[in-house]
Amino acid sequence: GLKYSIKTIAEKQFNEIFLYDGIAVLNSADFDEKQLEDKISSIAQVDKSMLMQSTDGIAENESENQSVSMIVPKAPENMGDYIDLVSAENGSNLEVKSGSVIITQKLAKLLDLKTGDTITIKLSGHEEKEFKIGGVSKNYALHYIYITPDDFESVYGEKPVYNLSFIDLKKDTDENSFK
């Protein structure tokens, strides 16, 4: 029943969409960006990592609003190493590119949006902003919006503050022993 369907959704999300081995959640007040990258890369079991900013907000239309997380990858060109952004519309690979955002499938359905439409987002601590949708990606849990660092800075007038890192471990690492 319900337990099985929740387990199935989580397995699909973490086997098909999220490709990373782990996430380090960072208290950005403790480190600057360079220190964070150095600290993570100094961990012997880490093969590669990428800093991200995750900010909570609300996406809305005239009749509906949904909680979202806006993800700003430091290196959007490497996003595919950590999250498989596949078009829900045609199965092609999506890239986080300047001038538009990628939103996830269920969010698009709930707000009746598609590629080329405009989405309204209110992030915590910011005013409502509108974004052109450059793609709708497959996703099984929660709602995400992906945007480039340059577009984030252009729209919000501030540089991203990277507060998490996606991590891939070396092949011979026991994931259960990594802390």
Protein language model annotation of sequence segments:
Residues 12-16, 34-48, 52-118, 130-132, ...:
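Short beta-strand boundary microenvironments
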Residues 31-37, 172-179:
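Short, conserved charged micro-motifs
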Residues 17-18, 95, 136-176:
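Small-residue transmembrane helix packing/gating motifs
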Residues 20-31, 55-57, 168-170:
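Conserved short loop/turn motifs at secondary-structure junctions
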Residues 1-20:
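Alpha-helical transmembrane segments
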